[in-house]
From Swiss-Prot:
InterPro entries: RsmH, SAM-dep_MeTrfase_MraW_recog, SAM-dependent_MTases_sf. One of its GO terms (biological process) is rRNA base methylation. Specifically methylates the N4 position of cytidine in position 1402 (C1402) of 16S rRNA. HAMAP family: 16SrRNA_methyltr_H. Its EC number is 2.1.1.199. It comes from Mesorhizobium japonicum (strain LMG 29417 / CECT 9101 / MAFF 303099). This is Ribosomal RNA small subunit methyltransferase H. One of its GO terms (cellular component) is cytoplasm. It catalyses: cytidine(1402) in 16S rRNA + S-adenosyl-L-methionine = N(4)-methylcytidine(1402) in 16S rRNA + S-adenosyl-L-homocysteine + H(+).
Amino acid sequence: MTVGDGDDIHAVGGSVRHIPVLLGEVLEALAPAERDIIIDGTFGAGGYTRAILATGASVVAIDRDPDAIAAGRDLEVQSGGRLRLVQAPFSTLDEHVESADGVVLDIGVSSMQLDQAERGFSFRFDGPLDMRMAQAGLSAADVVNSFKPGDLARIFGFLGEERHAGRIARMIEARREKKPFEGTLELADAIETHIGRAPKDKIHPATRVFQALRIYVNDELGELAKALFAAERALKPGGRLVVVTFHSLEDRIVKRFIADRADVATGSRHLPEAQARTATFRKAGGGVTAGDAEVAANPRARSARLRAAIRTEAPARAGDFSIFGLPKLPGIDRPGER
């Protein structure tokens, strides 16, 4: 994410100029002040954290990627005690600070992860079919080589919105019987050969499948939902929640959460009436998108959308996944999924 038109914020651990998407809008919505405690739940290359530190606020920065944490250690030392790095899923953000004045989340894979071939997030380079942000647990290769075709089709269809999900799943089943998939280019080439690619196609035929695998392997939608519940518990009254998403599935989760938590008239049938009718957030504007100049500087910003909300004094509600309308996926079990 290298966009922006002012401050020169460098990527942690590198010399590339790095300004995160919607930086100005994030700071405006978050409104960090001196002595505030802000949780950056998706530290990544440290762009938001650096900008927040520059306001005089302190930051608890969380990332489940050990490489991101290691790259940020110098910044932690330079911060004079105002930055604390935590290697953990951002869904646990309320476990690492007693209370916070703000929470910011930048959802999705970081440019640093995409640029490392050995992480297997992209087919721009050949690398192992991995995609694990935490570098532990089920890999993309495990999913591709062992899941039933019906389960693969469901993952590709829902998480990647891939219209050829069934065809691709059946192709994978036939190919892996001869030889398991191991590399990113191997899978990408197999999909392109099977589906084809017209000259007018702007994206590679494997793009949506790779997106689906990454989201599934890291349970990104579930982590986001749990992080929103955690932010509700962590934020002080008047504290601000700011979330930047890059995909309609992610944005839908954030939008539904804010709408549910700001709604004093109705609530989930699974919760006590008194709880359901207490607003724990109030909306702070609608979805904010990048301007033409930012999109021109960084095409990735085109899909970015920022949503924000302000915490009320009401006690946090119980986490209820039914408000998100997430479908049941193989190996993932959450209350309220259909």
